[in-house]
Regions:
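Active-site core of glycosidic bond-cleaving carbohydrate-active enzymes
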Residues: 1-215
Length: 215
């Protein structure tokens, strides 16, 4: 999943990833969460209960649908699996406190000190952005409005908790934390330059070595 963009760019991976999506859907947990692996083998590291996997790995279900739409124009797969995605996002929302989720594998195997809630909430936000987009694509206007509102609340909570708007530092200011804030758009636009400067400085402080995790 992590290299799906690369594979989709070089190869015809539609059927391969469509099967992966189907496997996740088949193993969706009763409360709505998705498993860490599909087919499910019982692993649920830092999951959110009911046999669900960590929130970053649960993102695979929506993320792969996005890839198939972008690379192959497959809107049908988004329509077909929308009910399962909605059930999952509502499950994630039920696990949030003040619009934040505090558990995940986070910056896995990073050499830096990590804040699990920062990474988990960023993944939660991305889930909600994707279902908002999918609701728009499939003409579910009420859902689109509902999830747009939820995304705004998650972003506001993230900024209040983790973003130092004066300096542009996110969390502990590690390269991964700065990159997550930038990539997911979880910062006020007016401090983007400061956030980038903090990212560059964080990398420089580590002798230009990569200290982030593997996913």
């Amino acid at each position: 999943v992590g290299v799906s963009r690369t594979f989709c760019y070089f190869y015809d991976m539609h059927n391969f990833y469509a099967k992966a999506i189907r496997d996740f859907a088949n193993d969706q947990r009763p409360l709505g969460g998705f498993t860490e692996t599909a087919p499910y083998n019982g692993i649920a590291d830092q999951g959110l209960g009911d046999g669900s996997g960590p929130i970053g790995w649960q993102l695979a279900f929506a993320f792969l649908q996005k890839q198939l739409y972008e690379y192959y124009g497959d809107k049908r797969i988004i329509e077909n699996y929308y009910p399962q995605l909605k059930k999952q996002v509502n499950f994630l929302a039920s696990k949030a406190e003040d619009y934040m989720i505090d558990r995940c594998i986070n910056d896995h195997e990073s050499l830096d000190q990590r804040i699990p809630a920062l990474f988990a909430t960023a993944h939660f936000y991305h889930h909600v952005l994707l279902i908002t987009e999918f609701a728009q694509l499939t003409n579910r206007k009420a859902d689109q409005q509902q999830y747009e509102s939820l995304a705004q609340k998650i972003k506001a909570a993230f900024i209040q908790k983790f973003v130092q708007t004066g300096t542009g530092k996110i969390g502990n200011g590690t390269p991964a934390e700065q990159a997550f804030g930038l990539y997911y758009g979880l910062i006020p636009e007016e401090i983007k330059t400061k956030v980038i400067q903090q990212l560059v400085q964080a990398i420089s402080d580590r002798n230009n070595h990569i200290t982030s995790g593997i996913f």
